[in-house]
């Protein structure tokens, strides 16, 4: 007789072979689990535990995945995992009958079963279900990783999110919070009488942001098209058309680098409100993020990237000139000459990008970008950006070198970007042409010229406030995730060879 070898001691390939043989045997008996089409259940693990006092002794039906099996004599204890958590099953030969119990003993960890039984507590006070009937609903042909105690290799976790969710149930909470955040944000805007809309993902011009686009080809039209890098320009066309409050939650695609805060495919919300300005957008940004934290987490206090963050309303607001003066020691408000500004930046170790014009505005922004962002831990609105880096933004009436723009920073991460939108088509054309010149100098992230958008503006666009918020980063903030991949179910990964 062949020696019995526990599956845990078998090689991976041997375990797979044994599972396939068990499936073949079931099918030969006319018990193919894959022919099961439905299982009616009336309970789940969380509800049973939460309502034990009223459910004790009651008959229940539940379904889930077997995550452990202990004791293989006449009694077996198992952990059943469903969408709400785990609960112990008490499986006894006297309850199932010898024939069914022997079949049950052949079930493997990872198999999906339906259970009918009675709620009770064991002698050790563990809330459990005494199984009266166990039905195999799906056979797992592959064993769970690392002896089912968890999957820790991040590369495998992100490539096989289905296994990650299976063996690391806490991972699901990130995506529950993500769903709740999007729901909160949608309700917030709907209650302000915004209309949710959908705009094209494929466009003949990539506009609305400074980013390198993905390019694809439309076979029927025989033209190259760009996957959207923002939803700004089509949404502003709707403002021109008389839809005074619009927003879109959707995927954005940017053919750029990947790091803990960036994924080429990400989700944002963009919103535009006629007869409003960037101050109104600040209030909405603060209201969404702080309000979501309070509703979803029950607190304004969160921990992210090793920092304790207070999201309570009343966020700090400072101009870029003020921020650079405080953290870099240069008062750009006292400088008017381009060469002097560039020299002052260089003296602090700040270099302008090769493709950037050597101007006061570019020097101010370079100082902020390279020296200030790292200091912005608590929620802060940085306002009044240079016109050079804000091609779609209304100029400041007080200083035409600056624009009515803000970015929201938390823990040195940009969370949102908003403007008093530029509605002067003549000024907009001039700024587009500056962007075209930058592209010609080698900046492939500069804006493209969009003649149709300019045409729309020439019909008259009301004063408008607009904003974009990165949903993935907001979820990182609320969950404490240290990488964007933890809050995207299927992050972009390089294929394995």
Q: What feature does the model see in each segment?
A:
Residues 1-497:
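Class II aminoacyl-tRNA synthetase catalytic cores and aaRS-like
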């Amino acid at each position: 007789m062949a020696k019995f070898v526990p599956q845990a001691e078998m090689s991976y390939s041997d375990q797979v072979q044994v599972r396939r043989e068990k499936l073949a045997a079931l099918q030969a008996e006319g018990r193919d689990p894959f022919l099961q089409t439905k299982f009616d259940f009336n309970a789940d693990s969380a509800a049973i535990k939460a309502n034990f006092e009223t459910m004790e002794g009651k008959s229940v039906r539940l379904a889930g995945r077997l995550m452990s099996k202990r004791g293989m004599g006449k009694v077996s204890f198992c952990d059943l995992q469903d969408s709400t958590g785990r609960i112990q099953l008490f499986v006894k030969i006297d309850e199932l009958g010898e024939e069914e119990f022997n079949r049950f003993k052949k079930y493997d960890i990872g198999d999906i079963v339906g259970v009918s039984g009675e709620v009770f507590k064991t002698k050790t006070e563990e809330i459990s279900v005494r199984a009266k009937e166990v039905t195999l609903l799906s056979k797992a042909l592959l064993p769970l990783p690392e002896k089912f105690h968890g999957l820790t290799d991040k590369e495998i976790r992100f490539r096989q999110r289905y296994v990650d969710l299976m063996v690391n149930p806490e991972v699901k909470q990130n995506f529950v919070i993500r769903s709740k955040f999007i729901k909160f944000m949608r309700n917030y805007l709907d209650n302000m009488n915004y209309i949710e809309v959908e705009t094209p993902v494929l466009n003949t011009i990539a506009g609305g942001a400074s980013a390198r686009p993905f390019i694809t080809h439309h076979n029927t039209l025989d033209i190259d098209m760009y996957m959207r890098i923002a939803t700004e320009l089509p949404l502003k066309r709707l403002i021109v058309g008389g839809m005074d409050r619009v927003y879109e939650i959707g995927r954005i695609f940017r053919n750029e680098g990947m790091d803990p805060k960036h994924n080429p495919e990400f989700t944002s919300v963009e919103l535009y409100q006629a007869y409003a300005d960037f101050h109104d957008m600040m209030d909405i940004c603060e209201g969404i993020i702080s309000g979501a934290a309070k509703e979803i987490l029950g607190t304004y206090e969160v921990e992210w990237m090793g920092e304790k963050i207070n999201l309570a309303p009343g966020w700090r607001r400072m101009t870029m000139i003020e921020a650079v003066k405080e953290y870099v020691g240069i008062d750009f408000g006292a400088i008017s000459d381009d060469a002097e500004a560039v020299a002052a930046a260089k003296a602090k170790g700040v270099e302008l990008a090769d493709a950037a014009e050597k101007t006061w505005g570019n020097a101010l922004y370079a100082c902020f970008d390279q020296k200030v962002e790292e200091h912005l831990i608590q929620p802060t609105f940085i306002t009044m950006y240079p016109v050079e880096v804000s091609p779609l933004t209304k100029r400041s009436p007080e200083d035409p070198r600056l624009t009515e723009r803000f970015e929201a920073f938390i823990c040195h991460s940009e969370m949102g970007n908003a403007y008093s939108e530029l509605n002067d088509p003549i000024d907009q054309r001039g700024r587009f042409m500056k962007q075209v010149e930058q592209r010609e100098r080698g900046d492939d992230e500069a804006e493209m010229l969009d003649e149709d958008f300019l045409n729309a503006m020439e019909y008259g666009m009301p004063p408008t406030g607009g904003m974009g918020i990165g949903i993935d980063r907001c979820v990182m903030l609320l969950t404490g995730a240290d990488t964007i991949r933890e809050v995207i179910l299927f992050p972009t990964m390089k294929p394995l060879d």
